[in-house]
Every structure is written in structure tokens, then in C-alpha cells.
Amino acid sequence: MKPVEKMFSEKGSWFKGNLHSHTVNSDGRLTPAQSAAYYREHGYSFICFSEHDYYTDLRKILDRDDFIILPGLEASTYLITSDDFSGLFEPEVLQRGYCDMTFQELMAFRNKNVNFTLKKAHHIHGILGTKEMRAAAGENVFTVNQLYPIRIYLNQWDGVNAAQTLSDSLKQKGCFTTYNHPIWSRVDIEDVRDLQGVWAIECYNYDTVNECAEGEDTVFWDTMLRHGTDISCFASDDNHNGGTF
């Protein structure tokens, strides 16, 4: 029997990190300091606190020589459907077909109005990029503790255009982008296949594996590559601190 080849070279420097996690700054259960301590204790070298639609930069507080924080956020756009949106939105919004909300406004809307269905979602990371990326963003670069608006599409959308618009807007703020958990988000391959300029797709999401057995997204990555889309992949735990580490 041929021995299994090693997946990684023994040469060079290798670091373990997590690009997708949440704390009490969105819907996680631990503080950033508690979460950072847990990851350090388990041999990680870096983490991105990717709060929902809320950019944070905790480098000055939590960075260490052996553990670094990647500033970022998990930004969202949604397609919602209803037989009748009249009375829920202003006429100009209904005519335009979309509106922007903060995360808090969306939650209040959801709790108040039950006559709609959340049909699809795009969750895209913006992770603060290189000096060159930040310089190109100029005054648009993200500031600390910044809420990011959520675009809500009513009854229909051009899926790939919605995702491209969100990714491009994050890049204009000095970030590189990733596309997260497409199966959990209920998107079709046509909604993401032609995305351009996205660094990587999340091909494995451990949290959604545990939640609903829908965290293995390699079919999306493979289809995008077959179609000629230039995109890498990554795996994450999407930790919300809900159980034993």
C-alpha cells in the first residue's frame, strides 16, 4: 500500500487560526478577551472576531507577540418574500425593491412583522487588509466599532449582483473578502458562481455542521472553480461559544 502523502510541507512557518467567530459583541456568549484566551490555550495564533454587521478592531487590547487579532466583520444582505409588503415599507422603497437597515432595526422588524419569509442570505466577511488595501480605501477605510448597513431585497434579487455589490463595498473600505456557508444561506450556485475578487469561500463551517449538518460546502467551491472563477477556500468553526470548546 502506498503511504499517505503529507498534506503540508515540513518547511516554513505554519500557523493555526480561525477566521470566523462571534462574541458578546453580536450573538456569541463569551467576551472577546475570554474567547481570545481560549483560542490561545488551544494553540491558535490568530483569530478574527467577525461580528454580524459590526466592525471591531481589538488589536490594541488583545494583540500579543504569540497571538494576533484580525479586525473584521460578517456583513449581510437578505432576500425576504411576502404576498403583501404594503404598509411595511414606504412606497419609494417598494418601487426600488430594497432598503438598508442596521442589525438592530432588522431584529426589531422581524419581531414586529411575521408576514414575511427570509428566503436567502449572503454572509460575506470583510477582514482588514494590507497597508496597500487600506491606503487605497483612503477615508473610506473602516473605523473602530462601526455598524454596517444590511441591504434587504423585497421578493426578488439578482443574487450574484447582490453578493458582488456587498463584496465590492467591503473592499472599498480596505478589506479582503470571503463568502461564508452558502448551503446554510439557502443560495443557489447561480447566486455566487460568477463572483469576482473574493479571496475565498468557506468550504467547511463546523458550527453549521453541528447545528443542521449543512456545513460542508465543497460542492460550491468545486463548481465555481470548474466555471473558471478564481477563488480559494478556508475552513472555520463559526464559534458562538455555545458549548464545550
Task: Please place each PLM-identified region on the residue numbering.
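A metal-dependent hydrolase metal-coordination microenvironment
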Residues: K2-F176, N180, V187, D194, ...
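Substrate-binding cleft/loops of secretory-pathway carbohydrate-active enzymes
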Residues: R186-W199, N241-F245
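N-terminal acidic, glycine/proline-rich low-complexity segments
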Residues: T223-R226
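Short acidic/histidine-rich active-site segments
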Residues: T229-F245
